[in-house]
Design a protein with these regions (language model features):
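N-terminal active-site segment of His-dependent metallophosphoesterases
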Residues: 1-49, 53
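Active-site-proximal beta-strand elements of phosphoester/diester hydrolases
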Residues: 1-9, 123-129, 205-207
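Divalent metal-coordination and catalytic microenvironments
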Residues: 7, 35, 50, 61-62, ...
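Active-site environment of divalent metal-dependent phosphoester hydrolases
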Residues: 9-13, 38-41, 65-68, 132, ...
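Short, conserved active-site loop motifs that form the nucleotide-linked donor/cofactor pocket
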Residues: 28, 55-56, 123, 204
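Active-site neighborhood of divalent metal-dependent phosphoester bond hydrolases
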Residues: 43-116, 120-121, 141, 145-146, ...
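His/acidic metal-ligating clusters that form di-metal
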Residues: 99-126, 131, 135-189
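Conserved beta-sheet core of the metallophosphoesterase superfamily
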Residues: 162, 166-232
Length: 233
């Protein structure tokens, strides 16, 4: 079975409970659409668990990007802390130079997206989804080529893409060539939705149901793509 999750944010306990709930095994695959770190207290044990399991695939989110830039000396402690990175930074600052270098290599190698096909359905898995300034339309179909559009956005400014919320505000006339699955923006805050449930839009699915917004009713979601079954912890 193939599963997707997103925005776990250092909550290893809820993540592990989810794996138990879905009976995750070595025969399954799990794609995590970014933001495994920050805002929670179990950031590095979550990262290590994902790193060591070959059937769990992490896609880069804006918080992995901040982590990477901090290790490179580009993002300051103050900036990272302001974005929720304090607990992660405290863990990281105690690591050896070699361990930091290993983590940096891992973060730099994370993909921005993955394409998968299940039962003749094509899905484009990514963290934020879309940047309105980069829209490449296939002249034959009139559809936005999402992979080429994201490639262009990332080549121009990876940070702007990973932090973008544009997919939630696009005009109705815009159609994509693949079904997009995203995290990044909690469904609790989607206009005219505001629920801690997976959101199914006409053009995209949002699986960030606000795990680090539990004071607002948020929770961790997991979607099984083979049959559309939803799980929550």
């Amino acid at each position: 079975m193939i599963y997707v999750m997103s925005d776990i944010h250092g909550d290893f306990q809820s993540f592990y409970k989810m794996l138990v709930k879905i009976n995750f095994s070595s025969y399954d695959e799990l794609f995590i659409l970014g933001d495994i770190v920050d805002k929670g207290k179990e950031n590095l044990c979550l990262l290590d668990f994902i790193w060591k399991n070959e059937n769990i695939y992490l896609i880069k989110g804006n918080h992995e990007y901040l982590f990477e830039r901090y290790l490179q000396g580009i993002v300051t402690a103050e900036i990272w802390d302001a974005c929720g990175g304090t607990a992660t930074r405290w863990e990281v600052d105690r690591l050896s130079v070699d361990k930091k270098a290993d983590i940096l290599m891992f973060l730099k190698g994370l993909p921005i997206y993955r394409n998968i096909t299940i039962k003749d359905k094509s899905y484009f898995l990514t963290h934020s989804g879309y940047h309105a300034d980069f829209e490449i339309i296939d002249p034959k179909t009139g559809l936005v080529d999402i992979q080429k559009s994201v490639d262009g956005a990332v080549a121009w400014d990876q940070e702007q893409y990973l932090f973008s919320n544009d997919i939630h505000y696009i005009p109705q006339k815009i159609k994509f060539d693949k079904r997009i699955i995203v995290g990044h923006y909690a469904t609790l805050f989607l206009a005219e939705y505001r629920q801690a449930n997976i959101y199914y839009g006409e053009r995209y699915i949002d699986i960030d149901t606000g795990n680090k917004r539990r004071n607002r009713g948020g929770r961790l979601a997991c979607l099984r793509l083979n049959d559309g079954r939803e799980y929550y912890v």
